[in-house]
Design a protein with these regions (language model features):
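Conserved beta-strand termini and adjacent loop/short-helix elements that scaffold enzyme active sites
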Residues: 1, 72-74, 201
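Beta-strand elements within well-structured catalytic alpha/beta cores of enzymes
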Residues: 1-2, 42, 148-154
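Active-site metal-binding loops of divalent metal-dependent hydrolases
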Residues: 4, 156, 202-204
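Loop-to-helix element that buttresses phosphate recognition and phosphoryl-transfer chemistry
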Residues: 4-55, 127-132
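Phosphate-coordination/substrate-recognition cap region in phosphate-metabolizing enzymes
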Residues: 28-107
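Glycine-rich phosphate-binding loop signature in dinucleotide/nucleotide-binding domains
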Residues: 34-37, 142-147
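Acidic, low-complexity terminal tails and accessory targeting/binding regions
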Residues: 76-100, 129, 144-149, 164-219
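Short glycine/proline- and acidic residue-enriched helix-loop micro-motifs
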Residues: 93-130
Length: 219
């Protein structure tokens, strides 16, 4: 699943907004109502991802440490600022208007395309080949070692990359998958000895009610 809404436009993006906390708790409450249980949890090392798991656990009515928990940077998001700097090295104003917001994501789209095709290398980031390999390794490890239900709390880039691996999508399609993943949305995979299969993508069943319509966010 993707983390709840983070603090886009703030000095510190890597923390949940108030709505992000509510989205996460609501997902946990939804799963508790459905009797959903997990045998293991794998989370990236980013603060917003770990706060999302804390909110889910609260909604489930359990302690975050009550389940086997592993943290791995392989589930971390790419550095969007580093990606943008490969195509626009000059500082950008804060994306606090619709026009600047669109410009930010136009640049990000171009930078992602170049990174994924091996035409640009953002400073401080792995190559996209290595980024994708890290995600594949997490999925392969689950196949080998984790019977039962495993919850992965990650971000849009890794989730889109995982789906792209399964569907063998080209770079542009993977970017579109990335940009359309909503906060706290669930993507479900099944796994067998032969590998993984995509069951559902980007679902928000926990927000499928009139009182939660304004809880649906992309950033």
């Amino acid at each position: 699943m993707r983390h709840g809404q983070a603090s886009f436009g703030a000095d510190d993006y890597d923390r949940l907004s108030d709505l992000g906390w509510r989205q996460s708790r609501r997902l946990g409450e939804y799963w508790r109502g459905k009797g959903q249980q997990f045998d293991r949890v794998i989370v990236g090392t980013l603060r917003r991802q770990n706060e999302t798991w804390q909110g889910i656990a609260e909604g489930l009515g359990i302690s975050p440490g009550s389940l086997p928990l592993m943290q791995t940077p392989s589930l971390n998001e790419y550095d969007s600022h580093a990606v943008i700097r490969t195509v626009h090295p000059d500082p950008l104003p804060k994306a606090d208007t619709p026009e600047l917001y669109r410009h930010h994501f136009q640049l990000l789209r171009v930078g992602l395309q170049a990174w994924m095709q091996g035409q640009a290398q953002p400073v401080g980031m792995p190559t996209y080949v290595d980024f994708r390999a890290g995600i594949a390794a997490v999925l392969d490890d689950i196949c080998r070692t984790s019977p039962g239900r495993v919850l992965l709390v990650s971000s849009g880039g890794p989730i889109a990359t995982a789906v792209g691996l399964l569907l063998q999508t080209p770079a542009q399609a993977t970017i579109e998958l990335n940009f359309h993943i909503r906060n706290s949305a669930v993507t479900e995979l099944s796994y067998r000895a032969k590998g993984h299969r995509l069951i559902s993508y980007n679902t928000l069943n926990h927000l499928d009610s009139p009182q939660h319509q304004d809880w649906v966010t992309f950033t």
